[in-house]
């Protein structure tokens, strides 16, 4: 590592509720010279960025990208080589479908010091705020996380739908709004029961959180009817029934 270079922190900001930001993340944001951010952390966290920091909006949100991933990598490298303390601020956890691993590889190749600061992943926190524990002693002892937005350049899907359909635990799908209907069809086509409970949780952990509950057979039509939009988490499995019992949790913070 070069002694003249700065350092990059890949910081997870959690699912959106600003009070779920870790103490370390808060400290690093407050002391950053440069913050490279997208929209997933949410307005409350973004509004709390220090005025003294240089802020670079890379705009990755719901298919609207101000910069490509390659351009983001270049910014991180450039600012670090200028000797700056850089925070790459991400929603959730940097290493859970956050492309943090790709950014870390680039930093290693450029001999730039970096540190990963884990965040509370939305895959667990968002269902929790909707009254849906992803595991439950009486319902399931297993959970799997999958992406609903694979790399479009892949020749074949990396998802094994046959195995997922047979999986007896909870399936949590991140970034899956656009492909909600296709995902439900794939699970049913490979043997998952059409009446399997499904919940789609929009803007989870935020004051305007909204939950749509249905089944594999009707969730796509319900989502279309309710005009469901990203960001949203989809939960598939028997634990969804607990939403009616455990209720919703809201922050009361408008963000």
UniProtKB/Swiss-Prot annotation:
GO terms for biological process: methylation; siroheme biosynthetic process. It holds the Pfam family TP_methylase. Signal peptide: none annotated. CDD domains: SUMT (cd11642). InterPro entries: 4pyrrol_Mease, 4pyrrol_Methylase_sf, 4pyrrole_Mease_sub1, 4pyrrole_Mease_sub2, CobA/CysG_C, Siro_Cobalamin_biosynth, Uropor_MeTrfase_CS. GO terms for molecular function: uroporphyrin-III C-methyltransferase activity. It catalyses: uroporphyrinogen III + 2 S-adenosyl-L-methionine = precorrin-2 + 2 S-adenosyl-L-homocysteine + H(+). Pathway: Porphyrin-containing compound metabolism; siroheme biosynthesis; precorrin-2 from uroporphyrinogen III: step 1/1. Keywords: Methyltransferase, Porphyrin biosynthesis, S-adenosyl-L-methionine, Transferase. Its EC number is 2.1.1.107. S-adenosyl-L-homocysteine binds at residues 15, 91-93, 121-122, 175, 232. Belongs to the precorrin methyltransferase family. Involved in the archaeal biosynthesis of heme. Catalyzes the methylation of carbons 2 and 7 of uroporphyrinogen-III (UROGEN) to yield precorrin-2. It does not catalyze the overmethylation of precorrin-2 to trimethylpyrrocorphin. Homodimer. NCBIfam families: cobA_cysG_Cterm (TIGR01469), PRK06136.1 (NF004790). This is S-adenosyl-L-methionine-dependent uroporphyrinogen III methyltransferase.
